[in-house]
C-alpha cells in the first residue's frame, strides 16, 4: 500500500475521488433533465405572458377599429359629410334651389321671346319661333328626378340609423364590451392563473433552478478538492486539513443526492401543475380568439355597409354633376336669349336706319333726275338749233349717225331698296 508523504493512504484518496466523480456524473445527468424541464416551464410561462400582451394588442386594435368605424366612418364621413351636408344641404337644398331658379329663368326668357312680336315678315309670329322651345325641359327633367333622389337619401338615412344602432348596441355595447370583460377577467394581472405564473410559479421556478445549481456546485467543489488531494501538490499540513474536509464532505454526498432526487420529483409535479395552469390559459386564449373573430366578422360586414353608402354616394354625385352641367347649359341659353332679344330690337333700329337712308337716296336721285331732264331738254334745244343752222351744209358722212341724233346723252336706271318687312 502506498501513502502520501503526509501518511494518507493513496487508496483512500482514490476512493474519495472516484466516489465524488461518480456522484458528480450522475448528479449532472439528473440535474440536466430537471433543468431542461424547468427551461421548458419558463419558456411556456414566458409564452403565456407574450400571449397576454398579444391579446391586449388585438383587443386595442379591435376597440380602435370599431370606434373608428363608429366615430369617423359613420358619424363624420357618412352622417355629417354625406347625409347632412353633401346630400341634404348641397344637393337636395342648394342644387334643387338652383334648378328651380334657373328653370324659372329660362321659362321667363322663353315667354319673353314669345311675347316679342316679329315684325319683319308674315312667316313668323314671335321671336320664340326662332328657338327650340324644348330647352325649357332641360332642367325640368332633373327636377322630376328629385323625388327619386330624396327617396334614396331617405332610405339610406334609415339604413344608416339601423347600422349605427347595430354598431352601438350589438358591437360596441355587446361583443366588444364582452371581449373587454373577458380579457379583464382572464388576462389581467389580478387573474389567479397569471398570479400563479408571476408569483408562486415564478418563485418556485427560480428556487428550483437555484437549488439544482447549488447541488451541482457543491458536488463539483467536492470533486475539485478530491482532485487537488489526489494531485498531492500541497504542503503536508494543508493536505491533511484538506483530507479532513473531503472526508466530512463525502459524508454529505448521499444526502445531496437524496435532495436532488426529491427536487426531481417535485419539479416533475411542478411541471404538471404549471402545465395544467398553462392549458387553462391556452383554453382562455382560444375563447378570446373566438370572441374576437366574431367582432372581425362584424367589421367585415361593416365594410359591406360602407360599399352601399359608396354606391348611393356615386349615384347622388352623378346626379349633382349632371345638374351642374345642365344649369351651366341653361345659363348660357338665358344669356343667348337675352342677347338675341336685344339684337332683334337693334335689328329693328337698323331697319329704320336703312329705310331713312333709302329715302335720302331717293330724294337725291329724284333731284338728280330732275336736273338731268332739264339739262337734256336744253341739250335737245341746242341740237335742233345746230341742225337748223348747219345741217344743210354738212355731208352725212362727216360724222355718221351723230349729226342729227337726238338720243339723250345719259341713261339713268336705278333701284331704291326700302323694305318694310
Swiss-Prot record:
Subcellular location: Cytoplasm; Preautophagosomal structure membrane
GO cellular component: Atg1/ULK1 kinase complex; phagophore assembly site membrane
Gene Ontology BP annotations: autophagosome assembly; autophagy of mitochondrion; piecemeal microautophagy of the nucleus; protein transport
Keyword Transmembrane: no
Primary residence: cytoplasm
Domain of life: Eukaryota
Effect of gene knockout: Mislocalizes ATG8 in the cytosol, when ATG11 is also deleted.
Molecular function terms from GO: molecular adaptor activity; protein kinase activator activity
UniProt keyword terms in alphabetical order: Autophagy, Cytoplasm, Membrane, Protein transport, Transport
General function of this protein: Autophagy-specific protein that functions with ATG13, ATG29, and CIS1/ATG31 in response to autophagy-inducing signals as a scaffold to recruit other ATG proteins to organize pre-autophagosomal structure (PAS) formation. Modulates the timing and magnitude of the autophagy response, such as the size of the sequestering vesicles, through interacting with and regulating ATG1 kinase activity. Plays particularly a role in pexophagy and nucleophagy. With ATG13, is required for ATG1 activation by autophosphorylation. Recruits ATG9 to the pre-autophagosomal structure.
Quaternary structure, from the entry: Forms a complex with ATG13, ATG29 and CIS1/ATG31. The ATG17-ATG29-ATG31 complex interacts with the ATG1-ATG13 complex. Forms a complex with SNX4 and ATG20. Interacts with ATG11.
Other remarks in the entry: Kluyveromyces marxianus proteins are shorter in length and have a more ordered secondary structure than their S.cerevisiae counterparts, which might contribute to the superior thermotolerance and solubility. K.marxianus could be therefore useful as a new model organism for further elucidation of the molecular details of autophagy.
The protein's name: Autophagy-related protein 17
Source organism (scientific name): Kluyveromyces marxianus (strain DMKU3-1042 / BCC 29191 / NBRC 104275) (Yeast)
UniProt lineage: Eukaryota, Fungi, Dikarya, Ascomycota, Saccharomycotina
Amino acid at each position: 500500500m502506498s501513502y502520501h508523504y503526509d501518511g494518507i493512504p493513496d487508496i483512500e484518496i482514490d476512493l474519495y475521488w472516484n466516489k465524488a466523480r461518480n456522484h458528480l456524473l450522475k448528479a449532472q445527468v439528473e440535474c440536466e433533465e430537471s433543468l431542461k424541464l424547468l427551461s421548458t416551464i419558463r419558456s411556456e410561462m414566458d409564452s403565456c405572458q407574450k400571449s397576454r400582451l398579444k391579446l391586449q394588442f388585438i383587443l386595442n386594435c379591435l376597440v380602435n377599429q370599431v370606434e373608428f368605424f363608429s366615430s369617423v366612418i359613420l358619424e363624420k364621413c357618412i352622417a355629417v359629410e354625406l347625409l347632412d351636408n353633401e346630400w341634404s344641404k348641397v344637393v337636395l337644398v342648394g342644387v334643387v334651389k338652383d334648378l328651380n331658379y334657373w328653370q324659372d329663368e329660362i321659362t321667363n326668357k322663353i315667354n319673353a321671346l314669345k311675347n316679342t312680336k316679329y315684325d319683319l315678315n308674315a312667316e313668323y309670329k314671335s321671336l320664340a319661333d326662332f328657338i327650340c322651345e324644348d330647352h325649357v325641359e332641360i332642367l325640368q327633367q332633373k327636377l322630376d328626378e328629385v323625388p327619386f333622389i330624396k327617396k334614396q337619401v331617405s332610405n339610406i338615412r334609415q339604413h344608416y340609423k339601423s347600422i349605427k344602432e347595430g354598431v352601438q348596441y350589438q358591437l360596441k355595447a355587446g361583443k366588444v364590451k364582452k371581449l373587454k370583460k373577458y380579457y379583464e377577467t382572464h388576462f389581467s394581472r389580478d387573474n389567479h392563473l397569471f398570479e400563479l405564473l408571476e408569483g408562486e410559479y415564478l418563485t418556485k421556478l427560480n428556487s428550483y433552478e437555484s437549488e439544482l445549481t447549488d447541488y451541482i456546485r457543491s458536488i463539483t467543489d467536492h470533486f475539485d478538492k478530491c482532485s487537488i488531494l489526489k494531485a498531492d501538490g500541497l504542503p503536508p499540513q494543508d493536505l491533511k486539513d484538506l483530507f479532513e474536509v473531503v472526508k466530512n464532505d463525502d459524508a454529505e454526498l448521499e444526502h445531496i443526492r437524496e435532495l436532488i432526487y426529491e427536487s426531481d420529483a417535485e419539479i416533475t409535479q411542478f411541471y404538471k401543475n404549471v402545465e395544467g395552469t398553462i392549458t387553462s390559459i391556452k383554453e382562455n386564449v382560444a375563447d378570446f380568439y373566438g370572441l374576437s373573430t366574431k367582432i372581425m366578422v362584424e367589421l367585415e360586414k361593416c365594410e359591406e355597409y360602407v360599399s352601399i353608402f359608396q354606391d348611393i354616394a356615386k349615384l347622388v354625385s352623378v346626379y349633382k354633376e349632371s345638374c351642374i352641367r345642365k344649369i351651366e347649359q341653361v345659363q348660357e341659353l338665358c344669356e343667348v336669349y337675352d342677347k338675341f332679344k336685344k339684337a332683334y330690337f337693334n335689328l329693328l333700329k337698323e331697319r329704320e336706319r336703312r329705310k331713312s337712308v333709302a329715302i335720302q337716296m331717293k330724294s337725291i336721285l329724284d333731284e338728280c333726275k330732275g336736273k338731268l331732264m332739264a339739262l337734256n331738254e336744253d341739250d335737245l334745244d341746242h341740237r335742233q338749233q345746230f341742225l337748223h343752222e348747219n345741217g344743210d351744209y354738212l355731208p352725212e358722212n362727216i360724222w355718221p349717225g351723230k349729226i342729227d341724233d337726238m338720243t339723250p346723252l345719259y341713261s339713268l336706271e336705278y333701284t331704291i331698296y326700302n323694305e318694310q318687312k
